Amino acid sequence: PPKRQSLMALLEPSPPKEDPVPTLFLERTDRQLQTTGDPIWNLRIEIPGEPLRRFDAVSGRANRQSADRDRMGSRAPLPVGRYSVGAVEPLTDGAYPEIGPVWISIEPTFVTGRRVLGIHLDPSAGLRNANSGTLGCIGLVNRADMLELAQLIKRSGADRLVVRH
């Protein structure tokens, strides 16, 4: 005879579990760049079956951390939420000195006024030249980390980012 389901299983079925997929997460830490005061954000990539990898990053300008995250031009950190991650785009060396060698576009999956967002190197991170931090993107503070992250995204097909506070 076929096995009968319990009443609770029929009334409150549990949703099917999704298989884990490669995902990026961005969270603010309590650390900051000593010379400029830019808060350090932790960008990690979780690829199922592989060790967790973490990278130091900045988002927004040091003096704009509490600005309206949903307003275009606010220079605030990324708004909290989910984003889709685009292709890894190599850039011509020196063409965009404040973006570095690679651009990875990110697109909010929610309504916000923010546009033209991405993940890139912040070559001015920690320098006192008024360019430390980003206009709202995720800026990795180390070039080797940026190149490693780009390779991990390409290899794993990671296409989602979750920004937490």
Stretches found by the model and what they are:
Residues 4-132, 144-148, 153-159:
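Cell wall/extracellular polymer interaction/catalysis modules
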Residues 140:
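Short, well-ordered, aromatic-rich surface patches in folded extracellular/luminal domains
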